[in-house]
Amino acid sequence: MDFYSQIGQDRIVLKYLKNKKNGTFVDVGCGFPKHINNTYLLENQFDWTGVSVDLIMYSEQDGSTWNDCRNTKLIVKDALTVDYLTLFKDNNLPVNIDYLSMDLEPPDLSLECLFKIPFDEYQFSIITFEVDKNREGDEKRINQSREFLTSKGYVLIGSLCSGQDDVYLHNSLTWLTNEFQFVDEEIIWTKR
């Protein structure tokens, strides 16, 4: 199977959700429709549906656009101006969404956007959240995201690529952490 995400986010989601078919996702800061995209594989090989948000509609190197590669909706808009509660309702997303991917540049924007997600109305099974710990001023921002997600019922289970992304499971699913410890040549996965 070909994986498409940059640092293994799609692998982690499939591993923990046991290759789930017909799941749902929200991909904020999705980037390209296929290349280094965290949800392309989920949609195209596992029949997931969802909604993605990015400031720009990127094209692949071959010139293909989102509409050429994907069936799910792309909202081309500044992620910080999106009303996520309305977006989720208008797109008939279930209250229990399988995957939330947050990957905005710079990472400060990911944190600001995280606070806009309606966690009191929606629950996510797994979240990958870009913290990019090697950037200046990262410790405070990382601690804020971790404290916030913990307060919303999520458990930090590890990081990808030495702190590029934090990975969370909803506390109702933490029994899954006993089943897997993910390490391979391409992805550095550290269980916390």
Locations of the language-model features?
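A broad, low-specificity signal for short, low-complexity segments enriched in glycine/proline
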Residues: R11-V13, L87-N91, T128
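Hydrophobic packing residues within well-ordered alpha-helices of enzyme cores
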Residues: V13, Q61-G63, F88, L111-L114
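Short amphipathic alpha-helix with an adjacent loop that forms part of the alpha/beta core around
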Residues: L17, Y84-P94, L114-D120
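Conserved acidic-Pro-Pro-aromatic motif
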Residues: Y40-L41, Q45-T49, V95-M102, P106-R192
